[in-house]
Curated annotation (Swiss-Prot):
Belongs to the UPF0509 family. The gene is yciZ. It holds the Pfam family YciZ. NCBIfam families: PRK13658.1. InterPro entries: UPF0509. This is UPF0509 protein YciZ.
Length: 57
């Protein structure tokens, strides 16, 4: 994901919901963790370098 696309995120959340309905909780959690990591990485790339506080290092 190079840029935030709300429609794409909504589609991926819908896929996770389908996986949950099917009863495959492990895969659903794994997919959510991947989505979270991608979104956090994207935010980190778009945020200017701000010095971290000691508890974030």
């Amino acid at each position: 994901m190079s840029e935030f696309d709300a429609q794409r995120v909504a589609e991926r959340i819908d896929i996770v919901l389908d996986i949950l309905v099917a009863g495959d909780y492990h895969s659903a959690i794994h997919n959510l963790e991947i989505l979270k990591a991608e979104l956090l990485r994207q935010v980190a790339e778009s945020t200017p370098d701000i010095p971290k506080t000691p508890w974030e290092i």
